[in-house]
């Protein structure tokens, strides 16, 4: 699970034990001083990955909107690769809130959708001062929701 790039490895889980938070994610000791890491709510099952990748492969976008999403999705590895910055932006603000409807935990869907909405709002050409203060409150609430389901090492 920990490939060196993840913030959800054994060290992060041991930190959770020391902090006495998220007991459902604490590592479970097995034989020979090894540990098993329980699946977190943000881990997608292969079926959920397949549904999301199938949805993304089926998207057709107008010329110039973004790259062909079909070329970025690998059904073999159930992953998204080779995205340029604009493609990531479009994926985050437009496609992700729709694609995650297939995942189970409702609170996680809500937090991710709120995050996508925030990025969509701050990427607009003009933002009013009152809108900025509303967005500040909104992003603080969203961060609190994300802190409830993601490990502390993520932040």
What role is predicted for each listed range?
Residues 1-155:
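A structural signal for the principal folded core domain
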């Amino acid at each position: 699970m920990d490939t060196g790039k993840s913030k959800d490895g054994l060290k992060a889980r041991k930190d959770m034990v020391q902090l006495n938070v998220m007991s459902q994610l604490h590592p479970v000791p097995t034989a020979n001083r090894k540990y098993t890491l329980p699946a977190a709510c943000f881990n997608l099952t292969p079926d959920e990955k397949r549904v999301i990748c199938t949805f993304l492969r089926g998207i057709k976008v107008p010329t110039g909107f973004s790259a062909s999403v079909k070329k970025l999705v690998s059904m073999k590895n159930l992953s998204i690769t080779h995205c340029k910055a604009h493609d990531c932006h479009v994926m985050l603000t437009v496609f992700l809130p729709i694609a995650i409807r297939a995942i189970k935990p409702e609170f996680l869907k809500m937090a991710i959708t709120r995050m996508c909405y925030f990025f969509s709002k701050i990427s607009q050409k003009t933002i009013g001062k009152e809108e900025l203060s509303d967005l500040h409150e909104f992003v603080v609430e969203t961060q609190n929701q994300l802190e409830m389901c993601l490990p502390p090492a993520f932040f």
